[in-house]
């Protein structure tokens, strides 16, 4: 996803840079799992890097684009607790804007395959970003077959709060519940806007022996 986004930004003539080897985890998994000490170390390291990268730039020129809603929330909100603020953009927001500005021109084609979209918790309910991903899909000629629980009523994939690395002791994993909803739409593809969700939904499809492709 990150490589594809970079290629699209280049095509649109966007002036951007990547942190490369200086990029490290935002600390989201550590904080959500209760390891505040590790989170503080990682957040301070990132804040120092951002301060160096954006040195001398006015506030309106400090923008960070991420492909992960967890990073979006952690950098945009959690880091603000340390007095650090940046303008955050999820890649679907930026790409959607570039299309509206005609800096990117998709070649829409009517797909015969049915597709459904999963709203990530940290993109949707936490940050109220619902339409940009859907508008992007529509601009590509894709019709979204919504699951019963969508947008502000969307159901978690099961990865939040550090649960991605934990095994269930009782009951069924949340991702299997969500995957059942996606399969029930008759969709052949599931689009997601979060790497955590992609892992959980993909694992769920494997567990269900489903041929539905996760994008």
Give residue ranges: language-model regions.
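Iron-sulfur cluster-binding electron-transfer modules in prokaryotic oxidoreductases
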Residues: 1-215
